[in-house]
């Protein structure tokens, strides 16, 4: 509409008036009946920049009689075309992706379905029994025919029904440099309008981007109203959580006039949350958002993918990257129509385990020998009742026939099974031919038997269109499960690997905590019965061929989120983890302290030769393995091998269970630094103690771990058991000079500070490490926590005369940042990194008032005050 025609329409009252929103009924926007406007001029409530007037209220006009449902579909959504999709009717409501409309096409508010009385004067266009009791008020079409509709209350207080405006709530971006940015415009009451930028943030922007299928990450921007021309403002103070599927589902206020902050409208910039290395993907030409031709956005333009070697494993990755769960299937030969523009990729060979197509082996960008007749496509069929699959075979083309119903896969009994039934199943799965296979070829299912006495004519397009018994009614056992082998007609189909697997928090990509992606969420595996055979299957699925070792008891740290799987039982020969799961997903009796892990391509500890000893003995404070940060109190798991000088002083087993007594710091191959108070209880007899180096998980023997006897204990001569001053000691390990502990990437010495060095001025980036109190229990894995050094006056004020010049003060003073080093961490190191240099042990954990107590920082022995004494004893 040109500006002149817009102004003329404005003068003639041809534009609708924005009246208000109803916060209870999903903030649906209402306006007056466009067929029966009241006499006189009819202006919108607020147009910028020339007009500001509050909304007018008036009684709703008489309501019309409703015609028969038309055959035409509702108007197409503009942003869907922009995103490369052609909208199709949603089986229950408006076009797929817009099922949240709750206003009729003449502006009446929809009633909640549960609020509609059972007896009506006029019958709606279709049975609505399935919707009774629903608490929402979204427009629906129960029989899938005709336009969506809803009930509303008319001016006389009676309940009537009306068709809905399916474009209501559509959004688009205007005025940006590309389709991923611009001013937000919302379609309501037949007119595109904008949103006031008050309280507009990234959560609101992300909902817009998700609704437009332009990625899940949005950045909030603002645009001056002065550049937008004459346009209504609909909303202000939009308050989205960020996970809504449509802007209509967010809390917001109807625009009541006034002034927007700096007279700015809401705008967004959209991006895909996977980061710049993950290409932007969309599906085009399909009948829904769950299927279509694969198109990638690269170098400023959209292009397609060639179908050479394209299979279901590639489709799984595409569906995962798009956030679409369900069954992934690859389609070939431009099944969803030929695309335009360049062919971006060829020879894509995913394993099915990647999170993005960028991680798959493939050709270079733009290199191919294809035309658009070979454009690749995918379908990501949602797991709704009636979805079918073939399971337990060598690929997606063969196996037990399983049907999804009420959240669970079940089988089909073979009573009365015919070739026509097989034909319908294979055709629905995208294959040309098929035959019934012997049930002995595939492992028996342990789930329910959902269907029996199925009879197809061969003309059905969907398996559930065939006649059958009611769900769950049968007289069969699993020995009668239907098994099928379908023939792809020359197209190779590799095995679909089921849910993806990843390894987390290891020191390299070949080890870590095992996590699986199920139901749209990463979760862990419980270690009940976890063995090297299970680890072998995980490593094989990830593409590793060497020996595999299982790790238990959260060896790589505790995961977050759900525990998906328990009691895995692999023989070691399975193709993927999915073949080993015998228990229902999500059923377990575990905690994250039992998370399972693996090490792939495990060849044990490599022997340390003389060259290794020579190269490492001359350095200190070197961290060969460091990447991330999980907890002492307020801390986090360290990376295995990330603090190679961390050792533990342990009681020998005849004094108990060989338990950890104190932390300590390796200064050289034969000398260890710790706290003097560690020897108060059991004395300073060397027979009572051992030192463990290279340890990470206290209960799991590890390849770099070594327990060494104690040859000598040297406690500072000024230390008194009834005092905390001079709390420092040295321990000489058993062995020839400089040959006590063997250095490796996991065993290295720390550096000493300079004499009288003041770390508050020379060092930053400080950490405490140990196996101590985590706030819940003592940790099995080595913990780390960043900790700030504090001016000594904080501890002098708190501890008075107990704090001396031979001590350091460190910790967080705020209760919500509880970082402290306690109990099992006594004697352990406080390490700081010299800028651009190495790691130095500035403190030895000594004492404090409680653990992580507000206003009670930890006290550490100041190592720089004892450097001459340390060097005189150790000859370093």
Swiss-Prot record:
Residues 57-72 have a biased composition (Pro residues). Disulfide bonds join 94-166, 110-150, 139-164, 196-260, 209-270, 240-250, 306-370, 319-380, 350-360, 413-476, 426-486, 456-466, 526-590, 539-600, 570-580, 620-751, 662-678, 766-832, 795-809, 822-851. Residues 94-166 form the Kringle domain. Residues 632-875 form the Peptidase S1 domain. PROSITE patterns: KRINGLE_1, KRINGLE_2, SRCR_1, SRCR_2, TRYPSIN_DOM, TRYPSIN_HIS, TRYPSIN_SER. Keywords: Disulfide bond, Glycoprotein, Hydrolase, Kringle, Protease, Repeat, Secreted, Serine protease, Signal. The gene is PRSS12. Its EC number is 3.4.21.-. Residues 29-89 are annotated as: Disordered. This is Neurotrypsin. It comes from Gorilla gorilla gorilla. Plays a role in neuronal plasticity and the proteolytic action may subserve structural reorganizations associated with learning and memory operations. The keyword Transport does not apply. It is found in: Secreted. The active site is at residues 677, 727, 826. Belongs to the peptidase S1 family. Residues 171-272, 281-382, 388-488, 501-602 form the SRCR domain. Residues 43-54 have a biased composition (Low complexity). InterPro entries: Kringle, Kringle-like, Kringle_CS, Kringle_sf, Peptidase_S1_PA, Peptidase_S1_PA_chymotrypsin, Peptidase_S1A, SRCR. Residues 1-20 form the signal peptide. GO terms for biological process: exocytosis; proteolysis.
